[in-house]
Every structure is written in C-alpha cells, then in structure tokens.
Amino acid sequence: MTIDPPWEPPLAGTEVEALMGALDRLRATFRWKADGLDSAALGNKAIASSALTLGGLLKHLALVEDYYSTGRMTGERMGEPWASMGLPEDAQDWGFTSAADDSPEELYALYDGAVRRCRERVLSKLDNSGLDGPVAVFGGEFNLRRLLFDLLEEYGRHTGHADLLREAVDGRTGEDPDSDWVPPF
C-alpha cells in the first residue's frame, strides 16, 4: 500500500474534500516552486517580456489568500500583517511590485501565514454554512463554492507562472515536490 503525499487530493472524497484537496495541491506545488531561494532568485525577472518574479507571486498570493478569506468572504477589512504594511486602497499590483523590498524570510512567512489563516477561515465557514453558504462579495450572491473555485483559478494561473519562472531561475521542473518534501504551512 502506498501513502499519498500530503498535497494529493483524495481519489474518492466528498465535494469539500476534493475542492480543498485540489486547492492544497496547488498551494503546495506553488510553494515548492518558490521554495529555498535567495533574494536575487526571488527577484529575478527571468522572462524578458514580463515583470513577474517568484517573490512578487509569493506576496501577491499571500494577499489573495487573506483578501478572499476576509473581504470577499466576510466583508471584513484585512487586519495584520497587511494593516501595518501600507497596503494601498487599490492594491491590484502592489504585491507584485512591493515584494522587492522584502527578504526571502519575510515573503515565505507572509505566504505561509496567509495560507494557514485562509484555511482556518474557510474551514470555519464550511462548518457554519457549507459550500452553499453566502459570501460577502457581490452582495451575497456568491456562495463559498464559487469563492473557492475563484481561488483555484487564481492558483492555477500563478502556479503556471511560477513553473516557468523557477525553470528559468535554476532549472527546477516537475509537477510535484519530492515525496519527502513537507509544505511549511
């Protein structure tokens, strides 16, 4: 009998287990693609036609995790660590561009913490109202299921970006981490 790695979604799980498992797989794959790099590698604009960096993606997805699980899900404003970072009202590109000012340790901690916070908030919402529970975005017309699909879409896009960037930085390729790699979140 083989034991699936912690990022592998269940083969025959419930809808919640499948959705959360798919999201955790993308989170783990993204984190592995960005793992273990220094400032120069995280800030490397490895694709000439793009300003994207792995550091920028780490910070952007950390912001997305907290924004989806507060502003979009509950309507609440994001608190720390964002409140003390000078997050602008229109933060569309801020995570991408401001990451150059952060150390690798800060970026990894920011991302890992945001994943933990988002997971806790989503699991609490699931316990209280399930996938059909309304969320704050668009006046409650969205449900949690749709919010999770949007988060999966965001991760799908940026995990693909991270795949190309990491290969350009040091040649790392592949879909999954080694089986002994443990996601730090």
Predicted regions and their residues:
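Short, contiguous alpha-helical
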Residues: T2-P9, V16-A91, G133-F185
